[in-house]
Amino acid sequence: MTRMIHCIKLDKEAEGLDFPPYPGELGKRIYETVSKEAWAAWLKHQTMLVNENRLNLADVRARKYLATQMEKHFFGDGADAAQGYVPPTY
């Protein structure tokens, strides 16, 4: 049976995550309040941040930066925009 939650990011009832996606209290909080749809959107944004900012995930500072951005994305004022990213024009 699908676990339904009220997604804090999308402000609607949606399918919850299958397991906490991150360790610790932040992971538990995300698991309890973020939907699969919102998590997928974060993963796309996170990929843009890594690529555009040329982050090295072996660097502790880069991982801390992403954790901070993730918390801001879901529970704060929103994550940073990817520097240098220009959306395609059609």
UniProtKB/Swiss-Prot annotation:
GO terms for molecular function: iron ion binding. Pfam families: Iron_traffic. It comes from the Bacteria. Keywords: Iron. InterPro entries: Fe_traffick_prot_YggX (IPR007457), Fe_traffick_prot_YggX_sf (IPR036766). One of its GO terms (cellular component) is cytosol. GO terms for biological process: cellular response to oxidative stress. Belongs to the Fe(2+)-trafficking protein family. Could be a mediator in iron transactions between iron acquisition and iron-requiring processes, such as synthesis and/or repair of Fe-S clusters in biosynthetic enzymes. This is Probable Fe(2+)-trafficking protein. It comes from Janthinobacterium sp. (strain Marseille).
